[in-house]
Amino acid sequence: MNTLDKILDNGIIAISRGFYEEKLMKAVSKLIKGGIKAFEVTFEQGGDDLRTAEAITMLKSAFGNECAIGAGTVLTKSQLELAHSAGAEYIISPNTDIGIIRGTKELGLVSIPGAMTPTEIVTAVDAGADAVNLFPAGSLGIDYFKAVRAPLPGIKLFAVAGVNLSNIADFKRAGACGFGISSSLFNRKLIDEGKFDDLEYIARAFLEQIGF
């Protein structure tokens, strides 16, 4: 199974922002038990890019045979190259940057950039994107997603940001092929309190909402 197929298997990408070392490993382990098969480790703008790369390498080494590991919030060529060197299998950005998209494909990685308008979505695909994140989906809403999706049925469109247990099924029915979910899965309060088992149950709840 190739990287994109792994991601699309159930469509959920769990997004880790600001978790490292033991907390990250424990959280990912439980989310995998809950059925999650794709993880995104985000670069923190103004943060330590090397630390993000180390987290990607750590996850790839421990869980690479079970799931797809990617890098998120990739905004610069140096971050792209660092993510590739760290072992990232796919690259996610919040924006439509033709240079990043083309650079990602030149490295043989899956490209999933962010976009908000039909023009941006088509521009991303024309540049080589394998799929596109509609971002921020929660703020834009289900009706907006449907309206954008209707004239672009052949494009793989993810719903990212603001996706939760209350609306994920609606986005699925609206035509989303996948979902980027951060704090609802990487719940900071539960992780800080060491309640990692709860993450497994939350993951299962999300999958149940979309028929898994």
State the predicted function of each range.
Residues 2-3, 20-23, 43-61, 77-81, ...:
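Active-site-adjacent beta->alpha loops and helix N-cap segments on the catalytic face
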Residues 34, 61-67, 152-154:
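Short helix-capping segments at alpha-helix termini
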Residues 37, 89, 130, 177:
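Short acidic/polar active-site loop segments enriched in Thr and Asp
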Residues 34, 86, 107, 127, ...:
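Structural motif
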Residues 29-39:
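Catalytic domains of carbohydrate-active enzymes, especially glycoside hydrolases
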